[in-house]
Design a protein with these regions (language model features):
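Small-polar-interrupted transmembrane alpha-helices in polytopic inner-membrane proteins
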Residues: 98-99, 131, 135, 156-172, ...
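Hydrophobic alpha-helical transmembrane segments
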Residues: 15-19, 47, 51, 87-92, ...
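N-terminal, membrane-interfacial amphipathic/helix-forming hydrophobic leader that caps
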Residues: 1-72, 76-79, 83, 220-289
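Functionally important transmembrane alpha-helices
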Residues: 181-246
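Aromatic-anchored segments of alpha-helical transmembrane domains
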Residues: 24-31, 95-99, 103-104, 164-174, ...
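Juxtamembrane helix-loop-helix connectors linking adjacent transmembrane helices
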Residues: 5, 34-49, 70-140, 147-153, ...
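Membrane-interface helix/loop boundary segments of multi-pass membrane proteins
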Residues: 137-162, 175, 198-205
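Membrane-interface helix caps and helix-loop-helix hairpins in membrane proteins
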Residues: 110-117, 173-181
Length: 289
């Protein structure tokens, strides 16, 4: 077979695997869309449909790993006790980061909070249900099979910033992504993608990125009541944005478009970049060869 298809070891080149993933994903829509429509016709709301796109991406990923004669766990989904601990750790860190950002906005006079009279543990649980599926979906898409093939094919120095740009661009169509807000939101989203990418590289697992992503969104929306990436949320608290610039408060896009989010995320990226991680250095080198 011509070298354009296979490398010196006789394996299909990573670019073709990325194209295969995209092709299988597009083909899956022939089944996904009718199934989604049928479920909606039977009364399933958006809340209960949340697992459906995740199931679809998992199946596409599974098929690609089967074609490579690898287990699904090879993409960072080794569902064991260590994996669960990393998810929990990530959720705690992600929540703490968002609480720090909210506190900085509050101290700067950008927001006030009131308790929601209708608050309940059920609302927090509903938020957890929603955001766990969001985290799973976006991490599988942006830190899963495609990202890992990109690392194998080009190295992390190109794969990390490229996927960060794609992750940010994917949010450009969200509500509130306009004017100066777009600059700050794009910058912070790229930093967030770098953080999540390094979280995968330092652990060899999607557990920590999923936990970080979930904790960030859950604390931001379900707990603090901020908009999340431009989408309104009902939280335990009711935030009221005060008369301050949008670059300070994040505006209707949410705290992700705040300069404080940029500073906190940049600090987190620096810390995780300096962290040696839990993956043996030999494994990392082979991944970047």
């Amino acid at each position: 077979m011509p070298p354009i298809f296979r490398n010196s070891q006789g394996h299909f080149r990573n670019g073709w695997w990325i194209l295969a993933f995209v092709a299988i994903f597009l083909a899956s829509q022939v089944i996904y869309r009718p199934v989604s429509h049928a479920l909606q016709q039977h009364g399933f709301t958006g809340l209960w449909l949340s697992p459906l796109p995740v199931i679809a991406i998992v199946l596409v990923t599974w098929l690609c790993t089967r074609l490579r004669r690898e287990p699904l766990a090879s993409v960072g989904l080794a569902l064991n006790a260590r994996w669960l601990r990393q998810v929990i750790l990530g959720a705690v860190i992600g929540s703490a980061m968002m609480l720090v950002i909210a506190d900085l906005i509050y101290v700067a006079g950008g927001v006030s909070f009131a308790m929601d009279p209708a608050r309940s543990a059920r609302a927090l649980a509903a938020g957890a249900w929603t955001f766990v599926w969001v985290a799973l979906l976006e991490e599988l898409l942006f830190r899963g099979f495609v990202f890992q093939r990109l690392i194998d094919g080009t190295g992390r120095r190109l794969a990390l910033p490229l996927m960060a740009v794609l992750f940010a661009v994917a949010h450009w169509g969200n509500p509130g992504m306009e004017g100066p807000t777009q600059f700050w939101a794009t910058l912070d989203t790229m930093l967030g993608a770098l953080l999540l990418g390094f979280a995968y590289l330092r652990t060899g697992s999607l557990a920590l990125p999923i936990g970080l992503h979930f904790g960030w969104n859950w604390a931001q929306g379900a707990l603090l009541g901020f908009d999340v990436s431009g989408f309104g949320q009902s939280g335990w608290l009711i935030p009221t944005l005060l008369d301050k610039p949008q670059w300070l408060t994040g505006g209707t896009f949410g705290p992700e478009a705040s300069i404080f989010a940029v500073l906190v995320d940049a600090t987190a990226v620096l810390l995780i970049w300096r962290w040696k991680g839990v993956v043996p250095q030999r494994s990392l080198k082979s991944a970047f060869a």
